[in-house]
Amino acid sequence: MKILFAVDGSDYTRRALDYLATHDWLRRDNAITVFAVALAVPHRAAAMAGPSLTHAYYHDDAEVALRPVRQAFAADGIQAEFAWEIGHPAEAVARKATRDGFELVVMGSHGHGALANVVLGSVATQVLARCKVPVLLIR
């Protein structure tokens, strides 16, 4: 199975990582891509900083989310690809899942109730609404 593991470096990512580590069916014989999204900086700031500094910022931002997963996977002998994009997290996750033919998206969620999601919104809720493939939310 082709799995997209969406991460943001939060405690919710840590919980999803712990879940993945203890559920062999998610790790065994699956192609896992760990995916982070760097939020776009305002165009004016990017123009002032220049392309190389802006790219370095995006790379460093994504690495904050990817590095702990890369280290945990290496320690557990889990093979995975690591990728990142710039954009809105929910849009980028749903787009990547569809574009690259993933069969499952795994991600952490803070677990707010329905009312909080209506008022506050959440990346997980938006991914559920936008994604065409199954999404496994870990709370």
What are these regions (language model features)?
Residues 2-52, 76:
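Small/aliphatic-rich secondary-structure junction motif
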Residues 1-2, 139:
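Absolute protein N-terminus
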Residues 33-35, 81-85, 136:
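General small-molecule cofactor/ligand-binding pocket signal
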Residues 21, 63, 67-74:
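Class I S-adenosyl-L-methionine
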Residues 52-64:
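A short acidic, glycine-rich active-site loop
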Residues 71-105:
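Structural beta-alpha unit
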Residues 95-139:
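Gly/Ser-rich helix-loop-strand patches that form or flank binding pockets
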